[in-house]
Every structure is written in structure tokens, then in C-alpha cells.
A protein has these predicted regions:
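Bacterial N-terminal signal peptides
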Residues: 8-15
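Sequence-pattern detector for short linear motifs
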Residues: 6-7, 44
Length: 219
């Protein structure tokens, strides 16, 4: 009985190790343009593709947060964003956000509702922003297919000389019938174009001058 228990525990540990190795190392680079590297991998226990974009910007943490928090202007720089608005401000660091995505005819446009939370490590000053779907927060909107699965995160890591490493991850099921070419846009072209625009927009005077009260900069 004891031998069987030990064997079972060992198998469980081995499975966990293999799973951890996959989730940390199984990325494939898809794009590397304008200083932005875009990777994908198959999500655990799913056929969906998870995306990771990594790039570097010389700017303050406040400027980045000011841009990310400026939801009303997402249509100006987020790829194919039609509308973006805050539905509920829970606190300085938590909110519920609604956004639409415009897709080519004859496909139906998509929309989603997400709850977003921000935290900052007191020692390293690393900022983590996590978003997950809240599809039932408001009723479905006519003309849009509501996305039921969306998980996203930003990790902002301050480095030397004012450089910030930005890592963005996205796992999304666009819902409904999606052709392969659109799926490719979702996981590669769309995020790449968004991050190219991000690097330009964060340098605008409006964001460069921003001082976000709850964000601590590196000394």
C-alpha cells in the first residue's frame, strides 16, 4: 500500500514538473519587428493559442500606466478597436472595462467585458496588471458576439537607465466560427500592430508628463 502511494505521488510530481516545463519554455517566436518580439504557444488543456509580446521602452512607469488607463483613446492605437469605455471604477487599481473589436465583413464584430486589477511590488517596483472576462456584467449588445474567454496580463519590469521591459500576454477565444486568417490576426498581426502603436503613443507629451499617484518609480 505504501509503495503504491509513493509511486502515485512520484507520478503526480513528475506530471507537475513536465507541465511546468511546458508552460515556461514552449513558446515559438512568430514575429520580431520594430523591437517587438511576438511568441505563441498552445495553451494548457486547450487548442487555443496563447500570445506573448515582449519589448522595451525608455520611459516612466507612470507614463505607461497613464496610457493603459486611458481607455477612451484605445480606438486610436489598439488594433481594430471600435469603442472602449470604463463601466465601473471599483478602486484606483481595479475596474470593469468594455471594448469592441471591428472585424471584416461578413463576420460579426466582437465585444468583451473584462475586470482588470493592478498591483506593484514594493521592493522591485514591478507592476502586474491582470484582466479576465466578465461577460455577464452587462447584457449582450445587438450586432456583436460577446467573447466568453479572455485572459490578459501586462508585466512592467523597470531596468537600468530608465528602461522598462514590457511583457503582454493574451489568451482569447473569439467565440463563433472564425477562419484561420482571422485567428492569425488575433494572435500575431493584431498584437504586433497594437504594440508598435503603443511605443509611439506612450511618448506623447500627455503621457510623458503623467504622474500616477499610486505608482512608485524606481529611485
Amino acid at each position: 500500500m505504501l509503495k503504491k502511494l509513493v509511486f502515485t505521488l512520484f507520478c503526480s510530481f513528475l506530471s507537475f514538473c513536465c507541465f511546468s516545463q511546458k508552460t515556461e519554455n514552449d513558446w515559438t517566436i512568430k514575429k520580431n519587428e520594430s523591437g517587438i518580439a511576438v511568441y505563441t504557444r498552445t495553451a494548457a488543456n486547450s487548442s487555443l493559442k496563447e500570445l506573448k509580446a515582449v519589448f522595451y521602452v525608455k520611459t516612466s512607469l507612470s507614463s505607461i500606466i497613464a496610457l493603459i488607463d486611458d481607455r477612451e483613446n484605445y480606438s486610436q492605437w489598439v488594433y481594430k478597436c471600435g469603442k472602449s469605455t470604463i463601466l465601473k471604477k471599483i478602486s484606483e487599481t481595479q475596474e470593469v472595462h468594455y471594448q469592441t473589436t471591428i472585424v471584416p465583413w461578413p463576420l460579426d464584430n466582437r465585444d468583451f467585458v473584462i475586470t482588470t486589477s493592478l498591483s506593484q511590488d514594493e521592493t522591485t517596483k514591478i507592476i502586474t496588471i491582470k484582466s479576465s472576462e466578465s461577460p455577464n456584467f452587462i447584457p449582450n449588445v445587438k450586432g456583436f458576439v460577446r467573447i466568453q474567454l479572455l485572459e490578459a496580463s501586462w508585466v512592467l519590469t523597470p531596468l537600468k537607465d530608465g528602461i522598462v521591459e514590457i511583457e503582454y500576454r493574451l489568451l482569447v477565444n473569439p467565440s463563433g466560427a472564425i477562419p484561420a486568417w482571422m485567428a492569425n490576426l488575433v494572435v500575431t498581426e493584431g498584437p504586433l500592430n497594437t504594440m508598435i502603436n503603443f511605443k509611439q503613443w506612450v511618448m506623447k507629451p500627455k503621457y510623458q508628463a503623467a504622474k500616477v499617484s499610486f505608482i512608485k518609480e524606481v529611485d
